[in-house]
Amino acid sequence: MTLNLRLFLAMRHTLPQNPQFYVTAPQDCPYLDNQVERKLFTALYGTNSRRLNNSLSKQGFRRSQNVLYRPSCANCSACMSARISSSEFKPSKSQKRILSKNSDIVRVVNPPLATDAQYNLFKKYITARHPNGGMSDMDADDFTAMIEETNVESKLIEYYAKKNGELELISFSLVDILDDGISMVYSVFNPYLKERSLGTYMIIDHNRLALEMTLKFVYLGYWVKGSSKMDYKKRFIPLEVFTEDKWICSTKVRQARPNPVNDSKEKLGVPIYLPSDQ
């Protein structure tokens, strides 16, 4: 989360009743070279938080604690929210092998409460995978806030495997339960268990969980065509992305920056539709 959003969270006691939208200052893009990013965001609070989260998640927004945000870059629209249909997704041969390889894993669904085991795994994951990222300096209190500061229906999906006869936490995901799907807010896995392909396994299993809960979609976060950091998401077929105010198949995305936002005409990019009582 950027500093702008952290300050915004600290000021939330002064916020008006109806959702207000703000744009962060530009900063370097973490996905595309020589690009800058900015985010459109609003507070998530009050009695209508769940309805607002449901509505805006369908419009490409993501949650971080009590803030909803989506990219609103001046000259680029490459970042697109991605989701898979739980009923249409069929694991590939390689994904089926990953499922077989991890048949010993135990899934546990818990309330969003932080533990020492989670934090220790989070630090191991960040140090190995994102040592220079924006979360590298998070302490235990920051981690607890990330997990527990939610006023929507959130869960912690934990995965355990036996080590020396005892169950050990090897991955977990903070998720929101939407009216039409599961939104994967943040995922962590043991980076040293590469043979398990835990990142892929977790997405497949979240799809199985969505089917068990009769939910239509699994929301995966953002996807950028051509970004090596995002390539793994296109392996989940069919992948849908939100662009130009609608969900389309990712194979129809022709280039990384299809339509830049024209600030002089439309400050926020595509329209935003709020729940009827907002």
Q: What is the role of each PLM region?
A:
Residues 67-76, 82-195, 235:
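A conserved beta-strand-loop-helix scaffold within acyl/acetyltransferase catalytic domains
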Residues 182, 186, 190-197, 213-226:
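Nucleic-acid nuclease catalytic cores
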Residues 56, 122, 203-206, 233:
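Residue-level preference for non-acidic, small/hydrophobic
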